[in-house]
From Swiss-Prot:
<keyword id="KW-1133">Transmembrane helix</keyword>
<keyword id="KW-0472">Membrane</keyword>
<feature type="compositionally biased region" description="Basic and acidic residues">
    <location>
        <begin position="47"/>
        <end position="59"/>
    </location>
</feature>
<keyword id="KW-0997">Cell inner membrane</keyword>
<keyword id="KW-0813">Transport</keyword>
<comment type="function">
    <text>Part of the twin-arginine translocation (Tat) system that transports large folded proteins containing a characteristic twin-arginine motif in their signal peptide across membranes. TatA could form the protein-conducting channel of the Tat system.</text>
</comment>
<dbReference type="GO" id="GO:0033281">
    <property type="term" value="C:TAT protein transport complex"/>
</dbReference>
<comment type="similarity">
    <text>Belongs to the TatA/E family.</text>
</comment>
<protein>
    <recommendedName>
        <fullName>Sec-independent protein translocase protein TatA</fullName>
    </recommendedName>
</protein>
<keyword id="KW-0812">Transmembrane</keyword>
<feature type="region of interest" description="Disordered">
    <location>
        <begin position="34"/>
        <end position="81"/>
    </location>
</feature>
<comment type="subunit">
    <text>The Tat system comprises two distinct complexes: a TatABC complex, containing multiple copies of TatA, TatB and TatC subunits, and a separate TatA complex, containing only TatA subunits. Substrates initially bind to the TatABC complex, which probably triggers association of the separate TatA complex to form the active translocon.</text>
</comment>
<keyword id="KW-1003">Cell membrane</keyword>
<dbReference type="InterPro" id="IPR003369">
    <property type="entry name" value="TatA/B/E"/>
</dbReference>
<keyword id="KW-0811">Translocation</keyword>
<dbReference type="GO" id="GO:0043953">
    <property type="term" value="P:protein transport by the Tat complex"/>
</dbReference>
<keyword id="KW-0653">Protein transport</keyword>
Length: 81
């Protein structure tokens, strides 16, 4: 009786979407995500930030290398078909 039901939440969400629009909400979500990421980076010590950046660079390099390796395979399959 005293709680908020799913229908009430849906009605509030619908009103918010109608008032602000999806583009405004999307940009607001992106800004909020950036703020949270910045806060997390500010809370970690400087040494950990450097190691996290190195890990991200390694993951990015590995991902791009895997994508480059997969690309010739798909091209050869396309040529065979």
């Amino acid at each position: 009786m005293g709680g908020i039901s799913i229908w009430q939440l849906l009605i509030v969400a619908l009103i918010v979407i109608l008032l602000f629009g999806t583009k405004k909400l999307r940009s607001l979500g992106g800004d909020l995500g950036g703020a949270v990421k910045g806060f997390k980076n500010a809370m970690t010590p400087e040494d950990e930030n450097k190691s996290l950046d190195d890990k991200e660079k390694d993951q990015t390099a590995a991902t791009s290398q895997q994508a480059a390796e997969k690309q010739p395979e798909t091209e050869s399959k396309d040529k065979q078909a």
